[in-house]
Amino acid sequence: MLEAYRQHVAERAALGVPPKPLDDAQTADLVELLKNPPAGEEAFLVDLLENRVPAGVDQAAYVKAAFLAALAKGEATSPLISKERAVYLLGTMLGGYNVAPLVALLDDAELAELAAEALKKTLLVFDAFHDVADKAKAGNANAQAVMQSWADAEWFTTRPDVPSEIKLTVFKVTGETNTDDLSPAQDAWSRPDIPLHANAMLKNERDGINPEVPGEVGPLNQIKELIAKGNQVAYVGDVVGTGSSRKSATNSVLWFFGDDIPHIPNKKDGGYCLGSKIAPIFFNTMEDAGALPIEIDVANMNMGDEIVLKIDHAAAKVTASKDGAVIAEAELKTPVLLDEARAGGRINLIVGRGLTTKAREALGLPVSTLFRVPVQPAATGKGFTQAQKMVGRACGLPEGQGVLPGTYCEPKMTTVGSQDTTGPMTRDELKDLACLGFSADLVMQSFCHTAAYPKPVDVQMQHSLPDFIMNRGGVSLRPGDGIIHSWLNRMLLPDTVGTGGDSHTRFPIGISFPAGSGLVAFAAATGVMPLDMPESVLVKFKGKMQPGITLRDLVHAIPYYAIQAGDLTVEKKGKKNIFSGRILEIDLTEMETDLTVEQAFELSDASAERSAAGCSITLSEEKVAEYLRSNITMLKWMISEGYGDARTMARRVENMEKWLANPSLLKADADAEYTKVYEIDLADIKEPVLCCPNDPDDAKLLSDVQGVKIDEVFVGSCMTNIGHFRATGKLLEKVPGGVLSTRLWIAPPTRMDEHQLMEEGFYNIYGKAGARTEMPGCSLCMGNQARVAPNTTCVSTSTRNFPNRLGQGANVYLASAELASVAAVLGKLPTPEEYQQYAAQIDSMSADIYQYLSFDKMGEYTDAAANVDTKKIAAAQLT
């Protein structure tokens, strides 16, 4: 074991990273060596046990905790670890498998006091709290000491406070840093391996950044030189963290600029992140990780500068100085940030505060005044928006009451989603949280990002992750099933709240607040999520859509109109974005056509590109009911196909049927207040709207970019549904000579869409035209597997067009499937007139083309569903 491990250490050292944490087999071997240590290896073996084994409910932690417990009880011995040291080490394991042994040791005359000291700093005790409380009531003095310590929040007060003044060295990245810059999609396979993945941070050349190996390894030496100055290094940028929700971006930043966590391998917390604008999901993820994110003007901060950051704790104000002169001032988003940073992160603070509250209640003490409390906004006397009412219901407020912007709350998480490039990190976070069962009503795991072209590490993950999720009561999809959102949307309950480890978790019914994997794990484990309620921006569409205009054009009209109003800028320095961090609420009541839920998702999905915190949409009860009837059949079909967890799906079916028995939807009050209201008359949108290379905010009319030569076209992603692929097929029938001059990629969102398109003959059309058909899933959209050729010009229906996302050096226009298909046929962006000639053919067949999958009307699914008794399954206990 030692020889193999040392070889692994050498291999990792060559990559400039520490070894991986020990797994359960290695830990078991280590235990045997510790019982009878080889001469000369003593210190090394102890270091491995103390510092290289994961905590929580990792299987290696189980082996470690069992060994330490056996040492403490005298059931095992080691010449290197005393009983006392074993108890201390149990106290470093955060929670989970270490808790029961420590609680039991409270009755041990020899070790009880040490066990109490260990428990005082342990937050993740969950139901074991009652065991300690019972011992305290029975007169156990050490249990009483633990309860008093928890009540006094010694877990918090013994940690160092955020310094009032600190000297920082600036690591400045100019312009916009998106999460793909910090955690490149092509390296998604390595995300759970935090140190190795961090090597790819900022690997692409850009102004002021000097990667070691451009396109492969980031600016490691540049970072080392700044660290060598002796100050803590702060990550600084004009616009920081836009794009995906991946916590791996935060992990990479903290790996270089954060603080070691004692006894926890390959993870860090703490650190400082300064940005003129910090994207909301990234901001939250930094909070969760124990960093201090500060929105402050960074115009006068440059790479390598030494600045002094002064933090007025009482006023929650920040001052940055350079060479003795003040260069920027700001207020913290909330004073609670200081408590979060001190606690080691927002999740630690929430869990710890809850533990302190429970202990004080048990001891008959008043509520603690130790922690900073968010200032709750005063009632306005006005009504509530749709989103505010949804969150209000999830917080248990009286029906019709909402949560005002600026309010701190913890809404119930009814639905939680996880996908396969964040799922392995979520699994690690769930282990750290000592989670053995989900409290959220439905947690779903997909395999849409890695199924098509998996690496060996992906295949291993695809084999191990489903059972991990299902064993905790979650629902697991299968590789090849398709995109997370296209499935998760079909499991939603109207007017409920949820989250997901993907920034496009944007519910078309209800509302979701996407998050990094740490917060997603917390939401899944506890069933609630912390939220500082955002303000809302309202977009009202009214009138009739013009010929040839698609929903994707309405999606792009939102940034287009905001640019015209001066509320959104494409320039990153001094960036303006009215949607950033706010809820985008979309009112469709004055549109002539009722949108289906599938259509509505195109609008809600793209709120991610606006950097909005969430999105809600007004839909008709009729369309929502149609959708739920279809989804009930789909869920029953899934149960018949052997998907798990069957009990969770059956329970969701029961709740859908309850809604259908008494349908109602929350609506905004007439006097609800919004930060801004945009009214978009559909009569004014007469030509397609695209987003230009390489920024999803850079919305322009087709006439502004017509004639651009196109090399490749992608029709796919969560922004598409079956209607888009039928439209593409109909347009491909018009290809001159029968074969495209462009390279066309086709990737349906789900295997049900693929199957139906094959049944209808569209795959024959795609093949004749020379299109490349991909496995249902994300395909090109994230750019982590298949990619377009370098330096090509493309049209894509995908979500984002950040630099290098779809392909190295690619210039990508975002457009509707209809416009993308015309570009594929013509090999260029058409003129508006050319486009309308093709679009007219689609409009004449629209009733047939834009038919969505109604599973309750499809025999293959209804026959299977008829044999599923969800009431019986939902009532059964988990086995």
What are the functions of these language-model segments?
Residues 31-48:
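Generic amphipathic, hydrophobic interface segment in small proteins and small subunits
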Residues 15-20, 43-59, 73, 80-95, ...:
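Structural detector for internal amphipathic alpha-helices that build alpha-solenoid repeat scaffolds
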Residues 2-31, 36, 337-350:
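Amphipathic alpha-helical packing elements
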Residues 24-32, 55-74, 93-106, 125-136:
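Amphipathic alpha-helical scaffolding segments comprising HEAT/armadillo-like alpha-solenoid repeats
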Residues 5, 27, 41-42, 64, ...:
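Short amphipathic alpha-helical segments that mediate assembly, nucleic-acid/protein binding
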Residues 36-40, 73-81, 105-112, 135-139:
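Short coil turns that connect the paired helices of HEAT/ARM alpha-solenoid repeats
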Residues 98, 114-879:
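Fe-S-dependent hydro-lyases/dehydratases of central metabolism
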